[in-house]
Design a protein with these regions (language model features):
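Short beta-strand->loop
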Residues: 98-109, 160, 255-273, 282-284
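Conserved C-terminal helix/tail region of periplasmic/extracytoplasmic solute-binding proteins
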Residues: 338-369
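Hinge/lid segment of periplasmic solute-binding proteins
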Residues: 89-135, 154, 160-163
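Ligand-binding pocket segment of bilobal, Venus flytrap-like solute-binding proteins
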Residues: 174-189, 193-264
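Bacterial N-terminal signal peptides that target proteins for export
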Residues: 1-12
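Sec/Tat signal peptide C-region and signal peptidase I cleavage site
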Residues: 20-26
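Mature extracytoplasmic/periplasmic domains
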Residues: 277, 282-343
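Early extracytoplasmic/lumenal segment of secretory-pathway proteins
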Residues: 27-91
Length: 369
């Protein structure tokens, strides 16, 4: 999803490359799309532009909270937004997401019915607003040799590696990074304590805050891209999204420096999170017609497979899976097994009061308060 060298190619190539080819854009056909950085194949946008004569203004983002703020403020300027299902559920309730016209989405039958059912159950009733794109989980990416060299008693495979202050103190000597994502870390911490990851009980957040305060001194950075620097031994332990763990492992192997990385996800019932990312159309979108065209295009099997092969994230497109590299589909970091998925939790839309409590817990954690 987030290999830094790819972002430059994507943002430049999607617009400049096509212009250099001398394409004349259809009059007034401009589509504004925002998505996580490095979360789409390099040629997906340019191929769409070439096929339909539509100019795409593609705007990568690196913070879910930032895109939420734009959407909630209104007049975001976007026609298509990539976002997490759990976040979209909140935006749907606020009237910020437009319902889909499924008569214009004949490729929707390619999406995995199990994922559609999960979405309808948890975040988008009747699948009225959201087109699934990728799905996955989170866990810990680590350098076993460096971990054991630094701390021979490290509990590899246990989330105590990142949530127990005694262990983390030792591992901090070789570098520990956390995702800069409260929507992942706070529920993960609740689950680690044996609490409901969707808890609405303030006492539970007090317990999480106390645990996080104890480990805060031993975290080097909060960075969603820290996994990219693990092959250089900047960190020995990082909480990551699963597919980024796979990217880190591959990057280390390609560097051929002797660094070997591995990944594990939280084990046990209700310990690991299942997330689903997808595409929505804001209610104030200026180009709804071409937004539907783009969503339908993204659900083509060959397009979905190309995106998955580039990002190494698990596509929600069932018909695309046979077209995806085996290195990706065979890795539990990218494609968790069905048995693992059965044990996972999904995050719920929490009452505003609890959301504020989560935000305060996260802010204090990062600040070391």
């Amino acid at each position: 999803m987030k290999m830094a060298n790819k972002l430059v190619h994507l943002t430049c190539g999607a617009s400049v490359g096509v212009l250099l080819a001398g394409m004349a854009w259809a009059e007034d056909r401009v589509l504004r799309v925002t998505n996580w950085g490095e979360y789409i194949a390099e040629d997906t946008i340019s191929n769409f532009e070439a096929e339909y004569g539509i100019k795409v203004i593609y705007d990568p983002y690196d913070s879910a909270e930032a895109i939420d703020a734009k959407l909630l403020a209104g007049n975001s300027g976007y026609d298509v937004v990539s976002h997490a299902g759990s976040d979209v559920a909140r935006l749907i309730k606020a009237g910020i997401i437009a319902p889909l016209d499924k008569s214009k989405l004949d490729q929707i039958s390619n999406i995995d019915p199990a994922i559609m059912a999960q979405l309808a159950s948890d975040w988008d009733p009747d699948n009225a607003h959201f087109i699934p794109y990728m799905w996955g989980t989170h866990g810990v990416t680590y350098n076993e040799a460096l971990v054991l060299e630094t701390y021979p008693d490290a509990p590899i495979g246990s989330m105590d590696m990142v949530f127990n202050p005694d262990h983390l103190k030792e591992l901090s000597k070789c570098g520990v990074s956390f995702l800069d994502s409260p929507g992942d870390i706070i529920p993960m911490a609740l689950a680690h304590l044996g609490l409901d990851p969707n808890s609405t009980n303030p006492d539970d957040y007090d317990k999480v805050a106390a645990m996080l305060a104890e480990i805060r001194p031993y975290i080097k950075t909060f960075d969603n891209y820290a996994y990219q620097r693990m092959p250089q031994k900047e960190f020995c332990v990082s909480t990551t999204w699963g597919p980024d763990g796979l990217l880190a492992m591959s990057g280390a192997a390609e560097a051929d420096t002797g660094v070997v990385l591995d990944f594990f996800l939280p084990e046990g019932q209700g310990k690991a999170q299942l997330w689903i990312d997808g595409w929505v159309i804001p209610s104030d979108a200026a180009n709804v017609e071409d937004a539907h065209l783009f969503l339908n295009y993204m659900m083509r099997p060959e397009v979905a497979a190309n995106d998955s092969n580039f990002t190494w994230y698990a596509t929600a497109n069932l018909t695309a899976k046979p077209l995806i590299d085996e290195e990706v589909t065979s890795s539990p970091a990218a494609f968790p097994t069905s048995d693992q998925v059965d044990l996972m939790y999904t995050t719920a839309v929490l009452p505003p009061k609890v959301e504020r409590l989560q935000t305060r817990t996260w802010t204090n954690f990062k600040a070391g308060n």
